[in-house]
């Protein structure tokens, strides 16, 4: 099998490429140049997609003895990930750029280009598993290492994308074992730290990044009765469930902390309230993508709304017209701080069935 190994310059993608080579595949390494921002076009910068990362990926490919290329996908990335990120925050929603990158870059732009060049699959360093089901179709499952499982950010893949995906680290028992394997192989990135930042915001200042893009859009911070508690310079600086940096000029009368309950960018208001008002008993989601058969009628599933969140039992049902359905989810266990724009991933056991983008929630009380 001809395999295109996406090599980010980190330890996971390097070991994944090595395992693909060991499996007897014809492997070609490719590093995606995604970002041209000044913060990433220097060595030693944080995040990923830096020049240093490209050099590390090349060193790993050289050690493995595989061809290596750098593909410039920066225009796709800016349009499909960065611009989308800014637009979503401007609309009062909370996007996950890693989900969008997997959907539109790694398993769309990269995969499409790879297939056009005669490759059969794209291999990445994600912690997830592709399993052949009883019907012969490829199924997406959680990784063996629950602590590192990344199936949530891959839940946006459709059935064809899953069929062309390869995750060689899916059966790795722990990340420590992956690092130990990299050390045994002599890979130069064996001890390289993991990246935890949004790659196009290497300093971690999301609010500052958005302010540069959107400018000041002043408004009010209010309680549920509409009483003004403070002011803000842009609703994009807030997300549902946020506690710190609210811009409240005085404490609540009961002395309890306040959290962001909702964001209304048109009215330029941020509504805050007590923690119990964050509890959600149901949610609605749109733009569903299924890599399994779409659920028919109410079905018992588990859902997850954050990359490292706990899955909770729920009843899911598709409603509305077939060409534009709404996924309605009734939670068996309430969740807290669920924001529009987040991805809800749907599971049956360890299998990922699909995902959708949360458009609204129903408070528990």
UniProtKB/Swiss-Prot annotation:
It catalyses: S-sulfanyl-L-cysteinyl-[protein] + uridine(34) in tRNA + AH2 + ATP = 2-thiouridine(34) in tRNA + L-cysteinyl-[protein] + A + AMP + diphosphate + H(+). Transmembrane segments: none annotated. GO terms for biological process: tRNA wobble position uridine thiolation. Its main location: cytoplasm. Disulfide bonds join 101-199. ATP binds at residues 6-13, 32, 125. Keywords: ATP-binding, Cytoplasm, Disulfide bond, Nucleotide-binding, RNA-binding, Transferase, tRNA processing, tRNA-binding. The record marks 126, 342 as: Interaction with tRNA. Coiled coil: none annotated. GO terms for molecular function: ATP binding; tRNA binding; tRNA-uridine 2-sulfurtransferase activity. Catalyzes the 2-thiolation of uridine at the wobble position (U34) of tRNA, leading to the formation of s(2)U34. PANTHER family: MITOCHONDRIAL TRNA-SPECIFIC 2-THIOURIDYLASE 1 (PTHR11933:SF5), TRNA 5-METHYLAMINOMETHYL-2-THIOURIDYLATE -METHYLTRANSFERASE (PTHR11933). This is tRNA-specific 2-thiouridylase MnmA. It comes from Kineococcus radiotolerans (strain ATCC BAA-149 / DSM 14245 / SRS30216). The lineage of its organism: Bacteria, Bacillati, Actinomycetota, Actinomycetes, Kineosporiales.
């Amino acid at each position: 099998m001809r395999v295109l190994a996406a090599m980010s310059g980190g330890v996971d993608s390097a070991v994944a490429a090595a395992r693909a080579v060991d499996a007897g595949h014809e492997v070609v390494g490719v590093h995606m140049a995604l970002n041209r921002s000044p913060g990433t076009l220097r060595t030693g910068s944080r995040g990923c997609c830096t020049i240093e990362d490209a050099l590390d990926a090349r060193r790993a490919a050289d050690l493995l003895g595989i061809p290596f290329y750098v593909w410039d996908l920066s225009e796709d990335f800016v349009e499909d990930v960065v611009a989308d990120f800014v637009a979503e925050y401007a609309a009062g929603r909370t996007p996950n750029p890693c989900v969008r990158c997997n959907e539109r870059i790694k398993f769309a732009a990269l995969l499409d280009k790879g297939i056009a060049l005669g490759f059969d699959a794209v291999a990445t360093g994600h912690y997830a598993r592709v399993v052949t089901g009883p019907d012969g179709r490829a199924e997406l499952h959680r990784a063996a290492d629950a602590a590192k499982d990344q199936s949530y950010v891959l839940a946006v893949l459709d059935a064809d994308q899953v069929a062309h995906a390869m995750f060689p680290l899916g059966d790795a028992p722990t990340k420590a074992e992956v690092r130990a394997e990299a050390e045994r192989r002599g890979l130069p990135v064996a001890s390289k730290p993991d990246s935890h930042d949004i790659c196009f915001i290497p300093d971690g200042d999301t609010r500052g990044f958005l302010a540069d893009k959107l400018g000041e859009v002043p408004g009010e911070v209010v309680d549920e009765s509409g009483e003004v508690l403070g002011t803000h310079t842009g609703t994009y600086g807030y997300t549902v469930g946020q506690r710190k940096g609210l811009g409240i000029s005085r404490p609540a009368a009961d002395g309890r902390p306040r959290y962001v309950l909702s964001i209304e960018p048109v009215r330029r208001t941020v509504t805050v309230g007590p923690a119990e008002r964050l509890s959600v008993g149901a949610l609605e989601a749109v733009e569903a993508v299924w890599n399994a058969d779409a659920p028919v009628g109410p079905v018992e599933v588990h859902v997850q709304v954050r990359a490292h969140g706990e899955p909770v039992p729920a009843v899911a049902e598709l409603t509305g017209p077939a060409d534009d359905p709404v996924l309605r989810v009734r939670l068996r266990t309430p969740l807290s701080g669920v924001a529009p724009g987040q991805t809800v991933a749907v599971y049956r056991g360890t299998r990922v069935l699909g995902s959708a983008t949360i458009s609204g929630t129903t408070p528990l009380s």
